[in-house]
């Protein structure tokens, strides 16, 4: 049985709840257990995952990054998006861990809600499927 850590950014609560619902529904239908931790925003996701990867007290087979960044009127959106993607990529590349990237980047809250809703785009569920696939691949290639 695979054990997965879900790191959920709660900055946009409604979107966070939808992402988490999609992900946990998918994981409940698999042979995986999971724990959920919350972080304040998307930028904090890579650090939280790295904390868990480096922890001597926890051992996860894979990680799920859930969150949302919505474009505003300043460059902040671009910096946050680039920082999150770069941070997650560095965690994966430097620690060889399976990770599903479910951080929505959208031009509006309405577009983000469509992507998060499990009855529509279901990014949370898709990301859970991706991490399960990567855990299987990792175990086959080790």
From Swiss-Prot:
Listed pathway(s):
Cofactor biosynthesis; riboflavin biosynthesis; riboflavin from 2-hydroxy-3-oxobutyl phosphate and 5-amino-6-(D-ribitylamino)uracil: step 1/2
Please list the reactions this protein catalyses.
Answer: (2S)-2-hydroxy-3-oxobutyl phosphate + 5-amino-6-(D-ribitylamino)uracil = 6,7-dimethyl-8-(1-D-ribityl)lumazine + phosphate + 2 H2O + H(+)
List the catalytic residues: 76 (proton donor)
Instruction: For this entry, list what GO says about its biological process.
Output: riboflavin biosynthetic process
The EC number(s) attached to this protein equal 2.5.1.78
Q: Which GO terms describe its cellular component?
A: cytosol; riboflavin synthase complex
Q: Which residues bind 5-amino-6-(D-ribitylamino)uracil?
A: 11, 42-44, 68-70, 101
Molecular function GO terms recorded: 6,7-dimethyl-8-ribityllumazine synthase activity
Checking InterPro entries in the record gives: LS, LS/RS, LS/RS_sf
Q: Which UniProt keywords apply?
A: Riboflavin biosynthesis, Transferase
One Pfam family named in its UniProt record: DMRL_synthase
Gene3D superfamilies (alphabetical): Lumazine/riboflavin synthase (3.40.50.960)
Q: Which of this chain's residues are annotated to bind (2S)-2-hydroxy-3-oxobutyl phosphate? A: 73-74, 115
UniProt-listed NCBIfam families: lumazine-synth, PRK00061.2-2
Family, according to the entry, reads as follows:
Belongs to the DMRL synthase family.
Q: What exactly does this protein do?
A: Catalyzes the formation of 6,7-dimethyl-8-ribityllumazine by condensation of 5-amino-6-(D-ribitylamino)uracil with 3,4-dihydroxy-2-butanone 4-phosphate. This is the penultimate step in the biosynthesis of riboflavin.
Q: What is this protein called?
A: 6,7-dimethyl-8-ribityllumazine synthase
The scientific name of the source species is: Wolbachia sp. subsp. Brugia malayi (strain TRS)
């Amino acid at each position: 049985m695979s054990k997965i850590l879900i790191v959920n950014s709660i900055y946009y609560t409604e979107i966070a709840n939808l992402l988490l619902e999609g992900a946990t529904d998918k994981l409940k239908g698999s042979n995986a257990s999971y724990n959920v931790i919350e972080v304040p925003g998307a930028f904090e996701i890579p650090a939280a995952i790295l904390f868990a990867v480096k922890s001597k007290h926890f051992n996860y087979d894979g990680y799920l990054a859930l969150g949302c960044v919505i474009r505003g009127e300043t460059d902040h959106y671009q910096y946050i998006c680039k920082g999150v993607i770069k941070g997650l990529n560095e965690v994966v590349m430097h620690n060889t861990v399976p990770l599903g990237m479910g951080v929505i980047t959208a031009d509006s809250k309405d577009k983000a809600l469509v992507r998060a809703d499990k009855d529509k785009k279901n990014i949370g569920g898709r990301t859970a499927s991706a991490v399960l696939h990567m855990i299987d691949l990792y175990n086959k290639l080790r």
